[in-house]
């Protein structure tokens, strides 16, 4: 059974007060239309047609690389007119029609609509809502059959009391669209060609109208302004949080937790408030994430503690390691088992060996640090000469004293000790003590300068 999909994305979205089309506003770090496209792609349709209008180039760029046909609606003359523009690009099969600004629609709901609609039926997705203001109402006859869809602007007082609304999502064979779309008239307040008129044509042609409903009301909610966008963001995040908690993870406050990508979790993890997940993140078992942390494209293994106000990006934190508080782990780091990246430590493209510690106020860049090393406070690996980056290698069991600078490229041998306050420019052999600082002098005849005072 073949399927074509039409996504309507021509609207400007004036209430967004934005320089980009409404469908390119973001929810959970993805554009609204990307959410919709992702849902319909799982249906494996033969083709997807996106009808563009306002700033069409931006929409096409956002969906670049996907198997989509773009059709330009030069004049925004309504939903019926928009689908008419797509008609020549559709195959002789069922057509699923939906909107690019309804981001939470699920594949399951769409699949149910498609599967229950026969080739000679009209499938309509409707929903019952508490506040139908601004939405088209489903009008039924005394037998309960759908007779028409009335837009709010055209509805009378009785029709405005109806709670069942049109979601704007339909499934209908192309043959029926070819017959009905040219018959739509713009005889309404807006002077637009409403796709909803196909309900009337279906009744006149004795076409069966198949009505299905969404699993959750939020799935059919559209976005017209930034307030609605923020509301749907919280709905999305709450839904994600509940799925994560069902897998055995405790979240301190689901209302203060954001996933802007994909999170794979183990069991018995604890996630504190204001944690943000970006890209693809994997948590092992018994992981603790402190407040205000940001995790992006990283792997966190079992029994790791990420303390508050820390960032981990593009790196792997091995079992039992500790990061933070106030630490930043930049891309291409490998923090080995039991290692510590402490408070106000920044690491970039660095291997920190098993059991090694950089507990505070340190920069580790382009470094390879062995096991069981101690990196003192204020240590800096000076990796950049203004043109190129250079590597610092520190052997197992080395001790780097506080406030030392390691001028790369440089090697510190296994078991070597660097005295505090040293600037190291040459390799240090294994088990050596190296001190590079001025000798301390005492001058007992020195007098401090005294400021002149007004007489």
Swiss-Prot record:
Residues annotated to bind UDP-N-acetyl-alpha-D-glucosamine: 8-11, 22, 73, 78-79, 99-101, 136, 151, 166, 224, 330, 348, 363, 374
Cofactor-binding details, from the entry: Binds 1 Mg(2+) ion per subunit.
Main location class: cytoplasm
Intrachain S-S bonds: none
Chain positions covered by the region annotation Linker: 227-247
EC number of the protein: 2.7.7.23, 2.3.1.157
GO cellular component assignments: cytoplasm; membrane
PANTHER family documented for this protein: BIFUNCTIONAL PROTEIN GLMU, NUCLEOTIDYL TRANSFERASE
Subunit structure and binding partners: Homotrimer.
Name under which the protein is recorded: Bifunctional protein GlmU
Source organism (scientific name): Francisella tularensis subsp. tularensis (strain FSC 198)
Recorded name of the encoding gene: glmU
């Amino acid at each position: 059974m073949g399927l074509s999909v039409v996504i309507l994305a021509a609207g400007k979205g004036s209430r967004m007060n934005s320089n980009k089309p409404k469908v390119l506003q973001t929810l959970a770090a993805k554009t609204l239309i990307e959410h919709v496209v992702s849902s319909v792609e799982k249906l494996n349709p033969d083709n997807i047609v996106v009808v563009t209008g306002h700033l069409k180039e931006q929409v096409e760029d956002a969906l670049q690389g996907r198997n989509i046909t773009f059709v330009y609606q030069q004049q925004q003359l309504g939903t019926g007119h928009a689908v008419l523009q797509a008609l020549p690009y559709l195959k002789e099969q069922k057509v699923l029609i939906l909107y690019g600004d309804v981001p939470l629609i699920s594949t399951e709901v769409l699949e149910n609509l498609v599967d229950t609609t026969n080739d000679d039926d009209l499938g309509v997705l409707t929903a019952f809502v508490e506040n139908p203001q601004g939405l088209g109402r489903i009008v039924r006859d005394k037998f309960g059959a759908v007779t028409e869809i009335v837009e709010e602007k055209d509805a009378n007082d009785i029709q405005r009391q109806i709670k069942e609304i049109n979601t704007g999502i339909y499934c209908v064979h192309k043959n029926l669209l070819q017959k009905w779309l040219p018959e739509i008239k713009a005889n309404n307040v807006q002077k637009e060609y409403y796709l909803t008129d196909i309900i009337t044509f279906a009744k006149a042609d004795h076409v069966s109208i198949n009505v299905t409903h969404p699993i959750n009301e939020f799935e059919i909610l559209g976005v017209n302004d930034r307030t609605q966008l923020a509301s749907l963001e919280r709905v999305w995040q709450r839904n994600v949080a509940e799925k994560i908690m069902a897998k055995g993870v405790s979240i301190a406050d689901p209302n203060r937790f954001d996933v802007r990508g994909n999170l794979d979790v183990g069991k018995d993890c604890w996630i504190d408030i204001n944690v943000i997940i970006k890209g693809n993140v994997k948590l092992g078992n018994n992981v603790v994430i402190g407040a205000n942390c940001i995790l992006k494209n990283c792997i966190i293994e079992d029994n790791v503690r990420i303390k508050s106000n820390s960032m981990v990006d593009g790196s792997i934190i091995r079992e039992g390691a500790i990061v933070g508080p106030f630490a930043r782990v930049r891309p291409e780091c490998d923090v080995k088992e039991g290692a510590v990246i402490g408070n106000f430590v920044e690491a970039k493209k660095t291997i920190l060996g098993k059991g090694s510690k950089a507990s505070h106020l340190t920069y580790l860049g382009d470094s390879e640090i062995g096991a069981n090393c101690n990196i003192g406070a204020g240590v800096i690996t000076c990796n950049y000469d203004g043109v190129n980056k250079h590597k610092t290698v520190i052997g197992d069991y080395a001790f780097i004293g506080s406030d030392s600078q390691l001028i790369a490229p440089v090697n510190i041998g296994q078991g070597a000790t660097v005295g505090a306050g040293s600037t190291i420019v040459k390799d240090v052999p294994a088990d050596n003590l190296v001190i590079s600082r001025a000798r301390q002098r005492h001058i007992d005849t020195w007098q401090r300068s005294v400021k002149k005072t007004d007489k």
